[in-house]
């Protein structure tokens, strides 16, 4: 789409949608300065956010880009985030688990969480990504390049084992592949089914945590998603295991209409339930495993809040 003038798309997309209104148009662009033109004038429903979010996340996974740059990513597409198609793999890019990229599919988990939950836009998962496809074959035209071919008569090994002769089950998968797929399933279902993610507000809390000794802004990234009476505190960890004490500013409470208190929270990926304090006066505490993420869902209701302790002062009055 990038090499075709936007005037053509303005005409073509409108003409197609007059007859087929449900058709979605996705553009592959490599210049963020023309994103808005191709959305508002050209009429594209979604844009591959390759040169913005994908490139940054790849760099973070490979430890040569700071996680703090994620803030710049959402700021670049502020107001059009719902039109961004986020992804970590596609037919052009190298597989995350390949030797040419990260060499380990687990390293994708924090990037997966960010890519799937940073905005209300869609997330694309490519064939076998959720199984940690390693692209170890040298397939004719493509050769051994960290990609799975789309040019040759070939099949993707991990997907072939998942298909299992039409059974579509875990019988031929390794334990590692099963665990990875389960994590993808939980994150993607949360992105689809949790209103705070699929349609909610976003608040980046990194600006008050850059000097936080419990959080490394180069390897961890924290933010909030909020809808109605539910808030999700998300921490993506691209580094070693961390015990983070995250500052949440009063501004977040004002903008998102949060009510401070101690609540029973559910961690979406693990299913664990713990009491968590949500307050501008005390840090939000969470442990995050290495190369993983924590997604704490809190229902902001009085029934969920811990009861306040009764005062020990009885019968007092001002004089």
Give the predicted meaning of each segment.
Residues 1-122, 127, 131, 137-138, ...:
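Alpha-amylase-like alpha-glycosidases and glucanotransferases acting on alpha-linked glucans and related
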Residues 49, 66, 174, 249-251, ...:
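Helix N-terminus capping/helix-initiation residues
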Residues 32-34, 242, 272-274:
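Flexible, glycine-rich phosphate/dinucleotide-binding loops
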Residues 262-281:
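Solvent-exposed beta-strand/loop surfaces of large extracellular or lumenal domains
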Residues 276-315:
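C-terminal beta-strand-rich structural cap/linker in extracellular carbohydrate-active enzymes
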Residues 317-319:
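Non-Sec secretion/translocation targeting segments of pathogen effectors
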Residues 78-81, 90, 95-262, 290, ...:
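Loop/helix patches that line or flank the sugar-binding groove of alpha-linked glycan CAZymes
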Residues 1, 27-29, 127-129, 235-238, ...:
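Active-site proximal loops enriched in glycine and acidic residues that flank catalytic Cys/His/Asp
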